């Protein structure tokens, strides 16, 4: 795992209060892990598949005006493209009802340890930090333990247009220590570069696309 992501996750876990009563009344913390069964498409050509692990942490609180925070780490390693994607998200609850939750905010995405293989076999990296808009939704199916979930990140920076979209189902299993949820769905990451392969004269734009099913679990307390 990328050292930056590891340090950030450990720090986040260390600073969380340990009082269960405080958690029930003032904050909610969640940790989760997923496996993304991604299929890559580079410059509109289907390439190899890769199992991409995904770890995340969120912290929601009752402080007025201060955003909730989230941290997500994704590692994709394929033959024609690879990256460590670290998302730092700051968001507010726009709608919070018994059967529906909708959040909006911003995400700073750090791409690290990246590699892109151009059609002429030259290799380039796209290590950079980008600004993205963020939205997520959770709709509970009445009288069931199931939620319909979705998340969307979109950014249009100077030389990179990016989107990261997820949709799926979530099953809740309440336990004494908190809430355990199992997830499954589909995720798409789409990156469009305008000036990535500068030394490859025949390449005007570069495309890195990955999509596939994911499964995972989340614990909230």
State where each predicted segment sits.
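Outer-membrane beta-barrel proteins
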Residues: 18, 56-65, 91-97, 137-143, ...
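Residues that define the transmembrane beta-barrel architecture of outer-membrane proteins
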Residues: 27, 49-55, 82-86, 100, ...
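Transmembrane beta-strands of outer-membrane beta-barrel proteins
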Residues: 27-31, 55, 67-71, 100-106, ...
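Transmembrane beta-strands of outer-membrane beta-barrel pores
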Residues: 33-41, 73-77, 108-114, 131, ...
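Gram-negative (and chloroplast) outer-membrane scaffold detector with strong preference
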Residues: 63-148
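Outer-membrane beta-barrel "beta-signal"
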Residues: 173, 208-221
């Amino acid at each position: 795992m990328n050292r930056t992501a590891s340090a950030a996750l450990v720090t986040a876990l260390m600073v969380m209060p340990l009082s269960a009563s405080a958690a029930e009344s003032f904050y909610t913390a969640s940790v989760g892990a997923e496996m993304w069964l991604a299929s890559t498409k580079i410059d509109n050509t289907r390439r190899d598949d890769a199992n991409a692990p995904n770890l995340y942490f969120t912290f929601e609180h009752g402080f007025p005006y201060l955003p909730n925070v989230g941290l997500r780490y994704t590692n994709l390693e394929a033959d024609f493209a690879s990256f460590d994607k670290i998302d730092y998200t700051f968001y507010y609850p726009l709608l919070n009802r018994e059967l529906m939750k909708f959040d909006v905010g911003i995400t700073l995405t750090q791409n690290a340890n990246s590699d892109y293989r151009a059609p002429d076999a030259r290799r380039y990296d796209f290590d950079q930090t980008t600004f993205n808009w963020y939205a997520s939704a959770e709709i509970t199916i009445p009288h069931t333990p199931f939620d319909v979930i979705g998340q969307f990140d979109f950014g249009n920076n100077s030389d990179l247009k990016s989107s990261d979209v997820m949709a799926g189902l979530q099953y809740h299993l309440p336990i004494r220590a908190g809430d355990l949820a199992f997830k499954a769905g589909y995720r798409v990451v789409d990156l469009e570069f305008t000036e990535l392969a500068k030394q490859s004269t025949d390449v005007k734009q570069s495309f890195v696309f990955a999509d596939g099913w994911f499964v995972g679990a989340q614990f909230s307390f």
